[in-house]
A protein has these predicted regions:
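Well-ordered alpha-helical scaffold segments within catalytic/enzyme domains
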Residues: 82-97, 146-163, 209-222
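Elongated scaffolding segments in large macromolecular assemblies
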Residues: 162-222, 230
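Bacterial N-terminal signal peptides
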Residues: 8-19
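A structural signal for well-ordered alpha-helical segments within the folded catalytic domains
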Residues: 78, 82-89, 102-105, 109, ...
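Solvent-exposed loop and edge beta-strand segments that line ligand/cofactor-binding
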Residues: 65-84, 131-143, 188-211
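Low-complexity, Ser/Thr/Pro/Gly-enriched N-terminal "stalk/linker" regions
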Residues: 24-79, 105-106, 110-127, 163, ...
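Acidic, His/Gly-rich catalytic cores of divalent-metal-dependent hydrolytic chemistry
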Residues: 221-243
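N-terminal secretory signal peptides that target proteins for export/translocation
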Residues: 1-5
């Protein structure tokens, strides 16, 4: 990830999402946000890693430079977009500005786009290439988690319209259902269709935290308690997740 984008994302997220005494009119914050938006948010509402030549359908099909899309402008679309959306929802809550709500809405549509370009149910693409649809075949858990993070924050806000909310809830339910049916593993596309890359039920410490978060987030969104019950969690923990 280029240092300039890393700095912009960390600056924006840190300053927007903490309790520091910062105001929207702070010039440095506004310049960072405006420049990040101008340079890295594409026409679909997906954040790119950097400004550069987009992969073509052939590049994506052949896995150039690799099937994961590493070192391409569309390597981390859901990761960056989901985190940025989480911050934009908070910014809109604080400011109440229509422009902030519009930008949050655009980012939510970007996440929806990432989950709508494949015929593999539950697949969330890393981004889209030059034709607005082509994508690399391998997603990952580090893309999937921020995808839920952003949409969770957005759908708990008052920003989406009733129609938009219905579409997004349906998509979240679809993706969550596929993950659950696959043992919370992340599906692949293209030449790797039927395989998985990453998941949320491993033995690492982060898997426990992210798995519990996904259960709570999806319940907040679709109110389906059966998903929590089927996880086999202790009764006390299951009840807390449904609070």
């Amino acid at each position: 990830m280029p240092c300039c984008l890393r700095r912009s994302i960390l600056l924006w997220l840190a300053l927007t999402m903490t309790g520091a005494s910062l105001r929207a009119e702070e010039p440095a914050i506004e310049r960072a946000h405006a420049e990040t938006w101008r340079r890295f948010i594409d026409e679909h509402g997906i954040m790119r890693d950097y400004v550069g030549e987009l992969p073509t359908p052939e590049d994506c099909r052949l896995g150039k430079p690799n099937a994961i899309g590493w070192w391409s402008p569309i390597e981390n679309g859901p990761m960056f977009t989901g985190m940025y959306l989480h911050a934009m929802v908070e910014r809109a809550r604080r400011s109440g500005a229509a422009a902030d709500k519009d930008q949050a809405r655009r980012l939510a549509q970007g996440l929806l786009k990432c989950a709508s370009v494949s015929d593999v149910p539950g697949f969330v693409a890393r981004g889209v290439g030059s034709d607005g649809k082509c994508h690399y075949p391998l997603s990952s858990d580090d893309q999937m988690h921020p995808w839920f993070l952003g949409l969770h924050a957005y759908l708990l806000s008052d920003i989406p319209s009733a129609d938009e909310r219905k579409v997004l809830v349906t998509k979240v339910r679809e993706v969550a259902g596929v993950l659950e049916s696959n043992g919370w593993r992340v599906p692949c596309d293209g030449a790797f269709k039927g395989d998985f890359r990453g998941g949320f039920k491993g033995e690492h410490f982060r898997d426990a935290a992210r798995y519990l978060y996904l259960l709570r987030a999806t319940y907040d969104i679709d109110r389906e308690a059966a998903r929590i019950r089927s996880a086999g969690l202790p009764d006390v923990l299951a009840e807390r997740l449904r609070l």
